[in-house]
Design a protein with these regions (language model features):
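Iron-associated oxidoreductase/ferritin-like identity signal
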Residues: 2-3, 8-195
């Protein structure tokens, strides 16, 4: 019994080392280019999450709690995306590097500006997912390709959702009653689990 408990402690310590990104415990044969690219995508997903969290606070301060809630749900979704990539690397016994994330830098004057920034950001994430998928095809990394197909579909939906909000806000113009109606509608958003 003691031996088994000792092994469990060792395995737990090995997992800790993997999570901290300080050593590689297993050589799984996963292409290092792919591992690096997935770790970069993890960083981008966490950067996205913190951008949306910042936008959420801005919108709540502006007096639009429904839009703030929508952005907070987007934050949760982006964290889920990052964690799914982490799980993929863990399942492949590849090294996971958890990044530090800098505070987002942006300027805005109106809530519409924040949603336009969101749309630009989602388009950058889409391009990054496409680049990662292209690399996986070139390197014949089929397991990661399968994972990425979900993200390709998700990005189409995310861009469309933000485009529709931008369109509605543009049509609202300076009509505060319309903006408040949209705010109320966005308050009902819930996040799908991605892990």
């Amino acid at each position: 019994m003691r031996w088994r408990a000792g092994v469990a402690v060792c395995l737990k310590n090995w997992q800790t080392v993997i999570h901290l990104g300080t050593a590689r415990v297993y050589d799984t044969g996963m292409n290092p280019k792919i591992v690096d690219a997935v770790n970069k995508q993890i960083r981008l997903e966490f950067e996205s999450a913190f951008l949306y969290l910042a936008f959420s606070g801005n919108l709540r301060q502006y007096g639009l709690p429904g839009m703030g809630h929508w952005m907070r749900e987007q934050y949760r979704e982006e964290c889920g995306h990052a964690l799914r990539f982490v799980t993929h690397l863990e399942n492949r016994r590849a090294q996971v590097v958890i990044p530090s994330v800098a505070a987002p830098v942006y300027t805005w004057e109106t809530p519409l500006d924040l949603f336009r920034l969101s749309l630009e950001h989602e388009r950058r994430i889409t391009a990054s997912i496409h680049d990662l998928l292209t690399l996986c095809r070139e390197e014949r990394e089929y397991a990661t390709q399968c994972l990425l197909f979900d993200y390709v579909k998700e990005q189409v939906e995310e861009e469309l959702q933000v485009e529709e909000i931008v369109d509605i806000m543009t049509l609202c113009g300076s009509r505060i009653d319309e903006l408040l109606g949209l705010d109320q509608k966005l308050a009902s958003r819930t996040t799908q689990a991605w892990e």
